[in-house]
A protein has these predicted regions:
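N-terminal Lys/Arg-rich, disordered targeting/topogenic segments
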Residues: 1-16
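A short, glycine/acidic-enriched catalytic loop
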Residues: 187-191, 263-298
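Active-site-adjacent substrate-binding region
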Residues: 301-328
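Active-site-adjacent mobile loop/cap segments within catalytic or ligand-binding domains
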Residues: 322-374
Length: 374
């Protein structure tokens, strides 16, 4: 029987190598164990926010995996589209000019009172029919003379879609403004004037100019505050403004001085002239046309202005019944000698709220466009 030969290392390998490998492995295990212990200790000893952060991150990872798993389990055709935000409706009409009015909760204890009234066309020898509207004649001209002149065609022709300005809108009393309350009240001491062009006559003129331009009638709008800082001399100021425009743009045929009225009772109650057009309340409007009296009021072209006033009155009342008060034909100057299409128009009064006036300005401009282009 042969004796077993002792086990030998492969040639060239030392007996110390296996022991070194074992030692290295043992050391690595010790280091790993120590690191794990330090991490655990740090977690247990960490401040609460740090621990919460770690837990939160872990929870996020779990939820993320759960969400991915859930998404994978839903067929593609059954996937739910992300929720879409509902876009606010785009306002394209006169509503885009409206402002937020003060609620009744803002009403002071000593607020002033406003009443509403719809004015009719009037009757009697002073009132001359003008289509569905009327002309209140306070001059010495006979009713027959006024009626005959009102029946004449416009003394000028508007060039539709022309780049040359045809109409100028301006404001002698630009700081006149309106009630800003939704209810029928006004703040005591409110003088119904403001230099803020977003709420005074400039706001109404802007609506009118935009409406005419949209109808193809090139219109300029001047927002000079001719009555500020001094009310005195406002007509001289506005006259100079209009003359500058006429010199620069001789194509202008119509000049509109846009104001608001101020109807107030003896007890301080303000009256708002109103009407309802297409289910919405509007301020009533009134055209004022001057007449030459031969002395203090020199208006040699008053007949041409009267024709224009009558055409506009007829158009507005035909299109929007109840919108107008009778045209006031009186011995007033108002710089109406500058063109044969110069008129003053009162859009509501200081008792109306601003939105009623803005709406009325829009309607008046629509009626004007029809009158000028017919």
């Amino acid at each position: 029987m042969r004796s077993r030969e002792p086990w030998r290392l492969p040639a060239g390998q030392s007996r110390a190598v296996p022991f070194l490998q074992a030692a290295v492995l043992f050391a690595a295990l010790c280091i790993f164990a120590r690191s794990a212990a330090l991490v655990l200790a740090a977690f247990l000893a960490a401040p609460v926010p740090a621990a919460q952060t770690l837990l939160h991150l872990g929870q996020q990872a779990v939820e993320s995996r759960a969400a991915e798993s859930s998404a994978e389990s839903v067929p593609e055709a059954a996937s739910v589209p992300p929720e879409q935000e509902t876009a606010a409706p785009v306002q394209t009409g006169v509503e885009r000019y409206f402002v937020a009015l003060q609620p009744d909760e803002a009403r002071p204890a000593d607020a002033g009172t406003v009443t509403e009234q719809q004015f009719g066309q009037g009757s009697g020898e002073k009132y001359i029919p003008c289509g569905a509207g009327s002309i209140k004649n306070t001059t010495r001209q006979t009713a027959a003379d006024v009626a005959a002149e009102a029946a004449q065609p416009l003394p000028f022709a508007i060039e539709k879609d022309s780049a040359a300005p045809q109409v100028l809108i301006m404001h002698t009393h630009a700081t006149e403004d309106y009630r800003l309350s939704a209810g029928l009240w006004f703040t005591p001491g409110d003088g119904a004037r403001s230099t803020d062009r977003s709420i005074n006559m400039c706001a109404v003129g802007r609506v009118m100019a935009d409406t005419l331009n949209a109808a193809g009638i090139c219109t300029l709008h001047d927002e000079t505050l001719n009555d500020y800082p001094s009310y005195t001399g406002s007509y001289a100021n506005s006259r100079a403004v209009v003359q500058q425009y006429l010199a620069q743009y001789p194509s202008i045929k119509v000049v509109l001085d846009v104001h608001r009225d101020a109807i107030e009772r003896e007890n301080g109650t303000r009256c708002a002239p109103v009407c309802s057009i297409d289910g919405r309340q509007a301020a009533q409007v009134m055209i004022i046309c001057g007449c030459d009296n031969g002395t203090s009021v020199q208006l040699p072209a008053w007949r041409q202005n009267l024709r224009f006033a009558a055409a506009w009155e007829r158009s507005m009342e035909a299109k929007y019944p109840g919108l107008t008060r009778p045209v006031l034909f009186s011995y007033r100057f108002y710089n109406q000698d500058l063109t044969t299409g110069s008129l003053l128009i009162e859009i509501g009064g200081h008792g109306n709220n601003l939105n009623e006036a803005l709406y009325a300005g829009y309607l008046a401009a629509q009626g004007l466009a029809d009158a000028l282009l017919s």
